[in-house]
């Protein structure tokens, strides 16, 4: 599927306690807020785990990332469902006759509160 400027791609995921535990093991990001539940039994999801949402969309379209900017606006907890909307902003050819891509994204939780936003650029393989 060929992407177009202005196109919006959406991906949604619910983060589980198991996701946080596995990411803690792999990343060694063992901050107390990731390994100790809050009073509601929730764990804070690592920011880099949350940031896999826009990278999933890039991966689906064979984007080799060159630059990624993230702004983490509020915490994501285990049990939260996060929707990531990626909007294609620009395409341009590069010096090797490949296509550069620039995209913006925003991620909201199940309450429609923005939890993360940013942009990425790269090359479509």
Residue positions per predicted region:
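Short alpha-helix capping/helix-loop boundary micro-motifs
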Residues: 67-73
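Generic structural detector for well-ordered beta-strands
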Residues: 10-14, 71, 121-123
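Hot-dog-fold acyl-thioester-processing enzymes
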Residues: 1-65
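Hydrophobic aliphatic residue packing
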Residues: 20, 26-29, 76, 88, ...
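HotDog/MaoC-like acyl-thioester-processing domains
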Residues: 1-5, 78-81, 87-125
């Amino acid at each position: 599927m060929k992407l177009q400027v202005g196109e919006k791609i959406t991906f949604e995921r619910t983060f589980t306690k198991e996701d946080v535990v596995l990411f803690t093991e792999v990343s060694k990001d063992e901050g107390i807020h990731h390994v100790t539940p809050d009073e509601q039994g929730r764990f804070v999801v690592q920011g880099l785990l949350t940031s896999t949402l826009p990278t999933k969309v890039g991966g689906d379209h064979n984007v080799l990332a060159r630059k990624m900017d993230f702004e983490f606006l509020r915490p994501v907890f285990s049990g939260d469902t996060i929707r990531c909307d990626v909007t294609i902003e620009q395409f341009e050819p590069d010096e090797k006759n490949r296509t550069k891509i620039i995209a913006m994204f925003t991620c909201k939780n199940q309450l429609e509160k923005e939890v993360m936003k940013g942009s990425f650029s790269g090359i479509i393989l």
